[in-house]
């Protein structure tokens, strides 16, 4: 943690990360909400919009409560815990110890990084929504989203971006090809092929 505090704030990087965070949020609401809303029958538009807003609310809560910690904490790796290859740990739950004064090696506050990564956690299940359109009740979608984020997204984010085993093997995922697109694509394919 002390190495994080020795880095100086890069205002240019920080400003760009804040702008990128806002742009990714706009891809979810209104972007995906309106896109999928335009693809369904008129009677289901409100349902799609509501499901997208639900994703933003619930996944944000999961991310703050324990998602960021599971994906990007190094607690388990530092202690030699065998779970380190799957999840990061619990030391950053509820963003404990993360503030504007904790500067990452890239020169941005860790809180800015956490919010940027939260936007990817939001948009990934929103991409899957298209496979569910007009096929599932809201309660079923709620259950799926919560479980999928916990079981599929958070471990994958740790494996590839948070120091997990894929990152240690040399996997590089610059634009979310693995964590976001493959992860959401496989889930959407399974749902699309699933007979209700």
Regions found by a protein language model. Name each.
Residues 1-196:
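Hydrophobic alpha-helical transmembrane bundles of multi-pass membrane proteins
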């Amino acid at each position: 943690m002390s190495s994080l505090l020795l880095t100086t704030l890069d205002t240019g990087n920080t400003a760009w990360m804040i702008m990128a965070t806002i742009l990714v949020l706009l891809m979810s609401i209104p972007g995906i909400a309106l896109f999928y809303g335009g693809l369904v029958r008129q009677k289901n538009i409100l349902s799609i919009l509501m499901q997208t807003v639900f994703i933003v609310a619930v996944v944000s809560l999961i991310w703050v409560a324990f998602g960021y910690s599971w994906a990007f904490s190094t607690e388990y790796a530092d202690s030699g815990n065998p779970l380190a290859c799957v999840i990061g740990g619990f030391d950053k739950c509820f963003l404990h110890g993360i503030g504007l004064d904790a500067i990452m090696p890239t020169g941005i506050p860790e809180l800015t990084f956490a919010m940027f990564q939260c936007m990817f956690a939001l948009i990934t299940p929103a991409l899957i929504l298209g496979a569910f359109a007009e096929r599932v009740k809201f309660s079923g979608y709620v259950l799926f989203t919560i479980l999928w984020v916990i079981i599929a997204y958070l471990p994958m984010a740790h494996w590839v971006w948070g120091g997990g085993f894929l990152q240690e093997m040399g996997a590089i995922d610059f634009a979310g090809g693995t964590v976001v697109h493959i992860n959401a694509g496989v889930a959407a394919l399974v749902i699309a092929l699933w007979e209700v």
